[in-house]
Amino acid sequence: MPRRRRRASRPVRRRRRARRSTAVRRRRRVVRRRR
């Protein structure tokens, strides 16, 4: 049981980080295009 909880926590954290990186990159691209 403890092993299953750790595995579920690992993929969830990686997906959250990737989503944040994409949002930051999209915002930076918009700022550069506006400038």
From Swiss-Prot:
Gene Ontology annotations of biological process type: cell differentiation; mitotic chromosome condensation; nucleosome assembly; spermatogenesis
Location (main, coarse): nucleus
Entry GO terms, CC: nucleosome; nucleus
Residues recorded with modification Phosphoserine: S9, S21
PTM description: Phosphorylated in immature sperm. Dephosphorylated in mature sperm allowing a stronger interaction with DNA.
Subcellular location: Nucleus; Chromosome
Tissue specificity field: Gonads.
Keywords associated with the record: Chromosome, Developmental protein, Differentiation, DNA condensation, DNA-binding, Nucleosome core, Nucleus, Phosphoprotein, Spermatogenesis
Note, other: Two isoforms exist, a major form and a minor form. This is the major form.
Reported function: Protamines substitute for histones in the chromatin of sperm during the haploid phase of spermatogenesis. They compact sperm DNA into a highly condensed, stable and inactive complex.
Name the UniProt record assigns to this protein: Sperm protamine alpha isoform 1
Originating organism: Scomber scombrus (Atlantic mackerel)
